[in-house]
């Protein structure tokens, strides 16, 4: 009986401990997500390989210009973490509506290739033809309302045969 009571006391002590913090926030502006923002904490998951670099770009202003070349507000390049998801802090000028794009440059060449992955805020479904012809998703599907520090999940997509999408969970 005393072992049962001791075990229950031990379990209650473990339950009272604070939840362990997640992965360290990466990027040159990591401190901006430790306060009140405004910032996006971009949570990137679904890596094909643990090599290369991530390029995160934020967009604001006119939603029809999201993802246009050269229209980004902030660009951050970081190494792919050895394990787990990547949390990147992206500060924004003020609370409001924004979008994010992420590119996983698998070989670190600085150029987009067929092995590279990508994703966007809102995780819109894109076809391989959308990627080939550089068609942008509807702004309503990718827009994020930032107030303070706002978490933005992004699942990476890769070319797989004749399609473009997230890797199967079993292959991670």
Which positions does each model-derived feature cover?
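Exposed aromatic-hydrophobic patches
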Residues: 85-92
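Acidic, glycine-anchored loop motifs typical of Ca2+
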Residues: 105-114
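Bacterial N-terminal signal peptides
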Residues: 8-20
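Beta-strand signatures of extracellular beta-sandwich domains
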Residues: 55-59, 101
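Short proline/glycine- and polar residue-rich coil/turn motifs
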Residues: 78-84, 145-146
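A short, amphipathic beta-strand motif
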Residues: 38-46, 56
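A short tyrosine-centered beta-strand micro-motif
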Residues: 93-102
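Extracellular beta-sheet/turn segments enriched in Thr/Pro/Gly and aliphatic residues
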Residues: 24-32, 40, 125-163
